[in-house]
Structure formats: C-alpha cells, structure tokens
Amino acid sequence: VIGGTNASPGEIPWQLSQQRQSGSW
C-alpha cells in the first residue's frame, strides 16, 4: 500500500504504520 491511508483487506494497523514511517512501500 503506497500512502498507507486506506487499509486493504488483510492489512493490519502495525503494517500500515511501518509502511508510512519507512516510506519504502
């Protein structure tokens, strides 16, 4: 997920948080 705002089915909050912070996704 690029942007990490909307969670896709199967994504969980800690994954979204790490994606937003790292910015590598």
Curated annotation (Swiss-Prot):
Belongs to the peptidase S1 family. The keyword Hydrolase applies. Activated by sodium dodecyl sulfate (SDS). Residues 15-25 have a biased composition (Polar residues). Cleaves the carboxyl side of basic amino acids, small neutral amino acids, and Met residue. It is also a plasminogen activator. It comes from Eisenia fetida (Red wiggler worm). Residues 1-25 are annotated as: Disordered. The keyword Cytoplasm does not apply. This is Fibrinolytic enzyme large subunit. Keywords: Hydrolase, Protease, Serine protease. Residues 1-25 form the Peptidase S1 domain. One of its GO terms (biological process) is proteolysis. One of its GO terms (molecular function) is serine-type peptidase activity. Heterodimer of a large and a small subunit held together by hydrophobic interactions. Its EC number is 3.4.-.-.
